[in-house]
C-alpha cells in the first residue's frame, strides 16, 4: 500500500510551490507595466522590497529583467530588519544550486544563483551594494531596523528639483513575512518619501485581514496598492484595486503634497551638505565627464560611470596608470573598525565588501589582477596598541565574517609562522595588486562605454567660464629656426569645455586654486620589497602591526610603510628601508623568522598618500571655500549664525567634484566612494546613509564647526 501521508505532504508542498510561482508571475506582470514602450536605457528603474523574501523570487525577477529589458538598468532595494532572515535566505539560496530533477535545467538561472552566493552578503547594519550584469542589475541590501534605514536615505533628483522624482522608487513588493505591526504609518510615510508620485505597492496575500489593513494605510499616504490574486488553477492575474484605477485627485492631492514636503524638509535640513547631480551642460560638452587622475579613485569612478553608459575622459599626468600611490605591488584590504562602530567604521565595512565584489567581477571577466583573500591578522606592538585592539574587538558583537578575536596559538596557526600574540583576524581580508586593479577597472570601463585616457597630461590649472570647465596643460613649442641654441618655449593648451569635472588626482588634489584649501595632507610612504626565503615562504596571511607584511607574490613580500609628512622628494631612502625592518622586528620581538626579512637589495617603491584628519575619504561637491569664508566674515559664531549655516545652501563650485583623501586604505575605501559619486552624478539614490554623506563631504571640516556656532 502506498505511503499516503508522504503522498499528501508531497502534494501540499507542490501546491504551495505553485501558489508561490503564481504570485511571483503576477508580481512580475505588475512590474512589466513600469517599462515604457520605448525603452529608455539612460534612466535607471528603481524597485523596492520589504523583507528579503524567497531567493527564487529574486532570481526569477533578475531572469525576467534580463530577458524582457536587457538594456535597462534596474536597481532593487531590499530592506530586511531581521538579521536572522539573511541566514535563512542564504540556506534557501544554496539549495537552489541543486535544482529539482523534475524541472528542465536552466543554466542562466543557475549562474545567477552562483553569483548571488559568491557575493556573500554579510549580516551587518546598513547598505551592501551588489552589481551584476555590468551594472544593469544593482541589488542594494539594507539590513537593520527598516524605519531607521529609510529615514537615513536621501531622496535625490536627476535635475536637482524635488518635484522631479523619476530617480525614486517606482514599485514596492511587500513580502509575506511583513506584518501590519511593523508596516505602520510612520514607515509608510518614509516609503512614500522615497517613492515616485505614482508608485504602487504590491501584496502577495491580499485576502488576509492584516494585509487589508496595510493596504488601507498605504492608500492613506497616497500610495497606490496592487494585489496579486491566484485562482485554484494557479492562473495569475495582477489587478489594481478598483478604487485606485482612477486616482481621486481631490483625495490624493493632500498626501502627495505631504510626501513632497517630507522630501523638501529632509533636503532643507541637509543644506550644509550639498549633494548635487552632474550639470546637464550643452551640445558643446557632449555629456562627457572629465576626470583628472590615474589611480584607483579615477579608474573606478570611470568604471562606475561606464556601467551607467556615461562618456568619460581621464587626464593622467604620468605615462601610465598607477604611477603614484596606487602603484604598489601589494596592498592590504581590511576594514577600519572603531570601538563605537560609528559611521566611519560602518563605511569601511561596506567599502571592504564592495571592493571584494568589484575585484571578483573583474577577475570573473578574465582581467589579470593578482590578489589573495588570505585573511588579515592584526596584533599590537606595545601595551597601548594592544589595549586599543582589545577595546575594538570587545566593544561590539562583530559579525564573524567581519572580524573576530584570536588567541596566541590560533594566531600562529593562521599565519603559518610563529606569532604567539593574541589579536584580531579579518577572515575576508587579504591583499590586492593596486596597479593591476587600477588598470583592470579602466579596461573594463573602456569595454562598456566611451571611456578614454590622455597620458602625460599634466593639468596645471582649471577654470570655469559660463558654467563650463576648461583644463589647461603646458606643452613645449619647438622653434623651426636654424639657430639650434634657441630654447624651446612653453605655452598653455586649453582642453574643454566640460560640464562636469572630477578631481581624483591623489597627491595633486590641492594643486588647483579651487581645491587648494582642502585639508588633505600628503604623507610619503616607502614600501620595501623583501625576497621570499626560508620561514617567510610559509607566511599564509597578511600581518598588520607596527608595520605590515604580506605573503609572497612572485617571490617577494611587501613590508612597510614609512610615514613622512609633506615630503620634499620621492627618492629611495635607505633610512626608511631600515625603519621598515625595525617595525617588523619591533612588532614580533625575538621571532627567528624576522631574521629572514632582508632589506639589503634596496628594493622599494615610494608614493604619497593624501590623508584627512578624520581618516575618511573626500567625496562629493567641491566646496567654494572663498565664498564660504566671505560668508563667515559676515556671520560670525553666534546662535543666529548656526541657523544661517544650517538653512543656507553651502557654496560649491558647480560642476566640480572631489574624490580623494583615501589615505593608507584606499583599496578598501576608494571603490565604494567612486560608486557613490557616480550615483550622485547620475541623480540616483546614493547607497550611503545621510550621516555617511555628511562624513565624506569635502566641506565637512568647516561645516562641522559652523553649524555648531564655533569659530573656524
Curated annotation (Swiss-Prot):
Its main location: cytoplasm. Keywords: Cytoplasm, FAD, Flavoprotein, Methyltransferase, Multifunctional enzyme, Oxidoreductase, S-adenosyl-L-methionine, Transferase, tRNA processing. Residues 292-712 are annotated as: FAD-dependent cmnm(5)s(2)U34 oxidoreductase. The keyword S-adenosyl-L-methionine applies. Catalyzes the last two steps in the biosynthesis of 5-methylaminomethyl-2-thiouridine (mnm(5)s(2)U) at the wobble position (U34) in tRNA. Catalyzes the FAD-dependent demodification of cmnm(5)s(2)U34 to nm(5)s(2)U34, followed by the transfer of a methyl group from S-adenosyl-L-methionine to nm(5)s(2)U34, to form mnm(5)s(2)U34. Pfam families: DAO. Its EC number is 2.1.1.61, 1.5.-.-. It catalyses: 5-aminomethyl-2-thiouridine(34) in tRNA + S-adenosyl-L-methionine = 5-methylaminomethyl-2-thiouridine(34) in tRNA + S-adenosyl-L-homocysteine + H(+). Residues 1-268 are annotated as: tRNA (mnm(5)s(2)U34)-methyltransferase. One of its GO terms (biological process) is methylation. It comes from Shewanella sediminis (strain HAW-EB3). This is tRNA 5-methylaminomethyl-2-thiouridine biosynthesis bifunctional protein MnmC. In the N-terminal section; belongs to the methyltransferase superfamily. tRNA (mnm(5)s(2)U34)-methyltransferase family. In the C-terminal section; belongs to the DAO family. The lineage of its organism: Bacteria, Pseudomonadati, Pseudomonadota, Gammaproteobacteria, Alteromonadales. Its cofactor is FAD. One of its GO terms (cellular component) is cytoplasm. It is found in: Cytoplasm. One of its GO terms (molecular function) is oxidoreductase activity, acting on the CH-NH group of donors. It comes from the Bacteria. The keyword Nucleotide-binding does not apply.
